Amino acid sequence: MTLTLAVYGKGGIGKSTTSCNISTALAKRGKKVLQIGCDPKHDSTFTLTGFLIPTIIDTLQEKDFHYEDIWPEDVIYKGYAGVDCVEAGGPPAGAGCGGYVVGETVKLLKELNAFDEYDVILFDVLGDVVCGGFAAPLNYADYCLIVTDNGFDALFAANRIAASVREKARTHPLRLAGLIGNRTSKRDLIDKYIEAVPMPVLEILPLIEDIRVSRVKGKTLFEMTESDPSLDYVCNYYLNIADQLLAMPEGVVPNDAPDRELFTLLSDFYLNPQTPVKSQEEELDLMMV
């Protein structure tokens, strides 16, 4: 049985870097993995392959849009740790519908029977869920993962994505596996959000410069660790996420917070910060100093 994952989150939050490292972690656990980039920028799999692979749209144009002339090897490229990679691509800037391209990519891969060849398929999807086309991967996913940080905007976007998961779960066996906190030294705002909208937190990745550098180098953290073993501890974050997913967690159908309520909840966190209450011992220590 194929495990299908869909990774969403605010634009620029680090979804692609996170996705590539999760895909690699799953491959390190012995799984055959396909990662599908669903973004017109077509850079989802750059960290796995080290270059911008041709997109399905590029290939269709070369074949004059004759779908029957396309073979799996025309659109699937081998990445690090044996992870297979596909990029949907998109229409020219300012023209056409990127969401439609995502839907067509899924359709083509199903016609090629590509979905049957893998233990895990991971969709890395553009930013927020802005239309039905970009929500299409949720129709095929077992779990949605939301990448966020400890900030207002990313959690506001996460809430909208949670609403899409809830809507799709009405007609599909879809669950939210949980949040992944990325590039954050704190999690207090994340904790405040999940108090209002209960959902699991799979992992919190601290602000580690090497994660950003890996993106620029076009390498996963696992590949960088081969020449710098001190980075092994970073890989353990992604292996932990992979192990949780392979255990087939129960997940949740989230109840998103209404926009205005969430706006008030999150903004209040900044405008009215809670001052931690000091214990008597702490007060005495302060007086002695």
UniProtKB/Swiss-Prot annotation:
What residues bind ATP, as annotated? G12, I13, G14, K15, S16, T17, K41, N182, R183
Q: What is its EC number?
A: 1.3.7.7
How is its cofactor bound, per UniProt? Binds 1 [4Fe-4S] cluster per dimer.
Identify the InterPro entries for this entry: NifH/chlL_CS, NifH/frxC, P-loop_NTPase, Protochlorophyllide_ATP-bd
Recorded metabolic or biological pathway in which this protein acts: Porphyrin-containing compound metabolism; chlorophyll biosynthesis (light-independent)
Quote the SUPFAM superfamilies the UniProt record gives: P-loop containing nucleoside triphosphate hydrolases
Which positions bind [4Fe-4S] cluster? C97, C131
- Record's HAMAP family? ChlL_BchL
Extract the NCBIfam families matched here: DPOR_bchL
List, separated by semicolons, the cofactors it needs. Answer: [4Fe-4S] cluster
Kindly indicate whether the keyword Ribosomal protein belongs to this entry.
no
- Reactions catalysed according to its record: chlorophyllide a + oxidized 2[4Fe-4S]-[ferredoxin] + 2 ADP + 2 phosphate = protochlorophyllide a + reduced 2[4Fe-4S]-[ferredoxin] + 2 ATP + 2 H2O
What are the UniProt keywords, alphabetically?
4Fe-4S, ATP-binding, Chlorophyll biosynthesis, Iron, Iron-sulfur, Magnesium, Metal-binding, Nucleotide-binding, Oxidoreductase, Photosynthesis
Instruction: Give me any GO biological process, just one.
Output: photosynthesis, dark reaction
Q: How does it assemble?
A: Homodimer. Protochlorophyllide reductase is composed of three subunits; ChlL, ChlN and ChlB.
For molecular function, the Gene Ontology terms on record are: 4 iron, 4 sulfur cluster binding; ATP binding; metal ion binding; oxidoreductase activity, acting on iron-sulfur proteins as donors; oxidoreductase activity, acting on the CH-CH group of donors, iron-sulfur protein as acceptor
The gene coding this protein? chlL
For this chain, the family text in UniProt reads:
Belongs to the NifH/BchL/ChlL family.
Q: Which Gene3D superfamilies match?
A: P-loop containing nucleotide triphosphate hydrolases (3.40.50.300)
Top enzyme class? oxidoreductase
Function of this protein? Component of the dark-operative protochlorophyllide reductase (DPOR) that uses Mg-ATP and reduced ferredoxin to reduce ring D of protochlorophyllide (Pchlide) to form chlorophyllide a (Chlide). This reaction is light-independent. The L component serves as a unique electron donor to the NB-component of the complex, and binds Mg-ATP.
Q: What is this protein called?
A: Light-independent protochlorophyllide reductase iron-sulfur ATP-binding protein
Q: Origin organism of this chain?
A: Rippkaea orientalis (strain PCC 8801 / RF-1)
